[in-house]
Design a protein with these regions (language model features):
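Generic structural signal for residues in well-ordered beta-strands
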Residues: 9-12, 70-72, 148, 308, ...
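Helix N-cap/beta->alpha junction signal
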Residues: 17, 50, 294-295, 364
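Short acidic loop-to-helix transition motifs that present clustered carboxylates
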Residues: 15-20, 53-54, 77-79, 272-274, ...
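Acidic, glycine-enriched active-site microenvironments
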Residues: 145, 153-156, 166-171, 175-184, ...
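Hydrophobic/aromatic ligand-binding patch that stacks against planar heteroaromatic rings
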Residues: 1, 24, 85, 136, ...
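ATP-dependent carboxylate activation and anion-phosphoryl transfer catalytic cores
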Residues: 1, 5-6, 28-31, 40-43, ...
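A conserved helix-loop-beta module that forms one wall/lid of the active-site cleft
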Residues: 1-45, 304-313, 365-372, 377-378
Length: 391
């Protein structure tokens, strides 16, 4: 279907044997996202960066066989993920909503915060996604609901997956637009057209809606709170505001995440994320934060000519960053990692932040969203019920 419609998809393959999985990964190029074909919720899904990690995954995490194949997808580094929900009566097709994920593609859609409307996508990209969604709905003869997950990289639109069913985003969009997509779709399935139902997906004017995932980490303090392809969230909240920053800040508060607006920020990021520090570090300093960082990140920040205090990694001896966290000497943690060993080595940092209720983000996209949140003045926030917004 994608070939027929001339739509783009990241390179992928299906493996029924160990050796076949290795060969596919070599052909499409690492890193790849691997997952069993027979699970939901991202269970046992993993981002692997090299052949050694893939071999470990195949040996320890899953069984590969003819009846239980493994799916491998090329990982689109730094891509923006987008959910698009569509409702159709078989003739007329409408876009219910376009939700831009805050965390980059590769984080499970159930765990990523989302913005409705999109907060940084160009009009051209949004129009292209709408066109592709409508073309796919026509090709599949959809009557009812359909969800498409897109990835946007360098202004190019890629299909991640298409689900001809309701998705977890439907209730959120329905609350925002004041129109139940499930109800509209159900009536469409029994023959009532969208036109007869006078369906509209128009958002209330001048408002942004942000979904934030609610995590169960408070109940499981020894679990690593790092986000990845496997879903960990157990709920979600909605933040509403006149702009993305305020809506995002309210969503964090609703999810019981405490955003301290000044103090000390600890930054330790993977090499591929260091380029983002050129913009992020000056902005977080302007907000009112002092910076502490481990050696590699501190070297990069010093090269920018910006102030930074060095702190030891746990492996470098005490006093180290975990001591700082446990002594409540840090107010915000920015920690991105790459590779199994790096994730394991830095787990104590994220767990210590969790235990001390220190806000921790494990993506740079999430870090920039925090900057937007800090730009909103909580003293000026207003609150409205959904009934008031959608009357």
């Amino acid at each position: 279907m994608l070939i027929k419609l001339n739509l783009k998809q990241a390179e992928s393959g299906i493996a029924h044997k160990f050796d076949q999985a290795i060969k596919i990964s070599e052909n499409i190029g690492l890193p790849v996202v691997v997952r069993p074909s027979y699970v939901l919720g991202g269970r046992a899904m993993q981002l692997v960066n090299n052949t050694k990690e893939l071999e470990k995954y195949l040996n320890e995490a899953v069984e590969v066989s003819n009846s239980k194949p493994i799916l491998l997808d090329s990982y689109l580094t730094d891509a923006v993920e987008v959910d698009v929900d569509v409702v159709s009566d078989g003739k007329e097709i409408e876009i219910g909503g376009i939700l831009q994920h805050i965390e980059q593609a590769g984080i499970h859609s159930g765990d990523s915060a989302c913005s409705l409307p999109p907060y940084s996508l160009s009009v051209e990209v949004q129009n292209e996604m709408k066109k592709q969604a409508i073309d796919i709905a026509k090709e599949l003869n959809v009557v009812g609901l359909m969800n498409i997950q897109f990835a946007i990289k360098d202004e190019e639109v890629y299909i991640i997956e298409v689900n001809p069913r309701a998705s977890r985003t439907v209730p959120f969009i329905s609350k925002a637009i004041g129109n139940s997509l499930a109800k509209v779709a159900s009536k469409a399935m029994i023959g009532k057209s969208l036109n007869e139902q006078k369906f509209s997906s128009t958002l209330p004017k001048g408002l942004s809606f942000v979904k934030e995932a609610v995590m169960p980490f408070d109940k499981f303090p020894h679990v690593d709170p790092i986000l990845g392809p496997e879903m960990k969230s157990t709920g979600e909240v909605m933040g509403i505001g006149p702009n993305f920053g305020e809506a995002y800040a309210k969503a964090q508060k609703g999810a019981n995440k405490i955003l301290r607006r000044s103090g000390v920020v600890f930054i330790s990021v993977k090499n591929s994320d260091k380029k983002y520090l050129d913009k992020f570090v000056p902005e977080i300093i302007n907000v009112g934060f002092k910076i502490v960082a481990t050696s590699g990140t501190a070297d990069y920040i010093e090269q920018l000519g910006l102030p930074v205090e060095r702190v030891n990694k746990v492996s470098e001896g005490r006093p180290h960053i975990v001591d700082n966290l446990l002594n409540n000497e840090v107010d915000l943690v920015i920690n991105t990692t790459e590779g199994t060993k790096s994730i394991e080595d830095s787990a104590s940092i994220r767990q210590s932040a969790l235990r001390n209720k220190i806000f921790c983000t494990t993506t740079m996209f999430g870090a920039f969203a925090i900057i937007d949140a800090f730009k909103s003045n909580e003293e000026n926030w207003t609150y409205s019920t959904l009934q008031e917004i959608n009357k």
